[in-house]
Amino acid sequence: MVAAAASSAFFSFPTPGTSPKPGKFGNWPSSLSIPFNPKSNHNGGIQVKANASAHPKANGSAVSLKAGSLETQEDTSSPSPPPRTFISQLPDWSMLVSAITTVFVAAEKQWTMLDRKSKRPDVLVEPFVQDGVSFRQSFSIRSYEIGVDRTASIETLMNIFQETSLNHCKSLGLLNDGFGRTPEMCKRDLIWVVTKMQIEVNRYPTWGDTIEVTTWVSESGKNGMSRDWLISDCHSGEILIRATSVWAMMNQKTRRLSKIPDEVRQEIVPYFVDSAPVIEDDRKLHKLDVKTGDSIRNGLTPRWNDFDVNQHVNNVKYIAWLLKSVPTEVFETQELCGLTLEYRRECRRDSVLESVTAMDPSKEGDRSLYQHLLRLENGADIALGRTEWRPKNAGATGAVSTGKTSNGNSVS
């Protein structure tokens, strides 16, 4: 009805007494037109013309009305197209609306994904620039990264240090096809190996905490590089952990230490920071006598997944081996708050190691000291270490003692 009304609005009404004119196709119009003169009321005459569209065929015959009589004739001509009206000439709005809806749904989905990704606490955040060389990244402590105390393990922290180091190199464009290797290092088959690691723990992050790691590099002697890390609580800004390390270059084929070539030095020196290490502990490590060790763990061997892409045992594994010989009662009553580790020799695939631990008689307040030795069964030293331990919860002012994570979530 709406279409008929809209169509009739485009046709003029005849004046009174006007007879119908022949249609477009002579005396055989394609529509049925019935003019009539209704009765006029006292207000004046009103002329009305009714137009009713009819199908051009009825049982195969054309139908028309001429001079008050109904005549039929077999349709021998081709069928005429349906009349063009205002409605029939409108575009198909349903297709346009469908296309617009599809575009908006896709855009909304993409925006939702980007918005969700930006709110994840463990993704790579935009690195801040401090003299163009510092790097910052956030992490969320997950359930499989904690121990029985709901705190992150020392291995978790070491893995975080390694991850931020590689991402720092990547952000500077120094990461080539190797594991932390620059283009010039790859040409000369050189890799980085850590020679010393020091860690100080004020408080361990707990399950659900979001931490922020800041790292930078500086020069260490003529043929070394040092890297420092600071771990802070994203919620309070409290410095939780400090760590510093010294690195040297080793030839991947000969497995011997190497000087830093001038070409490599030109790649890395522009990103060095002129600053002192965050930990300055010059105390020397004493070599243990295996016979006087308090605890020994034998038969330690590297597994296939202990090696990195440079075919080098990951430095995190050395710390795990070192702690294998620490008595269980130490872990039950104390927590590790300080670590110094010096790497002396590389561990090979077929190496068999033993871990030795001895308690140091000297004490620093309520802290206990332990000396460590990691060596091959043939007697060659792999690493020397010293650890400091304090009573549990002595340094905990966060989730363990308050019952809440840095995000305000309960850990009970």
Curated annotation (Swiss-Prot):
InterPro entries: Acyl-ACP-thioesterase_N (IPR021113), Acyl-ACP_TE_C (IPR049427), Acyl-ACP_thioesterase_NHD (IPR002864), FATA/B (IPR045023), HotDog_dom_sf (IPR029069). Keywords: Chloroplast, Fatty acid biosynthesis, Fatty acid metabolism, Hydrolase, Lipid biosynthesis, Lipid metabolism, Plastid, Transit peptide. This is Acyl-[acyl-carrier-protein] hydrolase FATB3, chloroplastic. One of its GO terms (molecular function) is acyl carrier activity. Residues 1-63, 393-412 are annotated as: Disordered. It comes from Cuphea viscosissima. Pfam families: Acyl-ACP_TE, Acyl-ACP_TE_C, Acyl-thio_N. It comes from the Eukaryota. The gene is FATB3. It is found in: Plastid, Chloroplast. The lineage of its organism: Eukaryota, Viridiplantae, Streptophyta, Embryophyta, Tracheophyta. Disulfide bonds: none annotated. GO terms for cellular component: chloroplast. The active site is at 310, 312, 347.
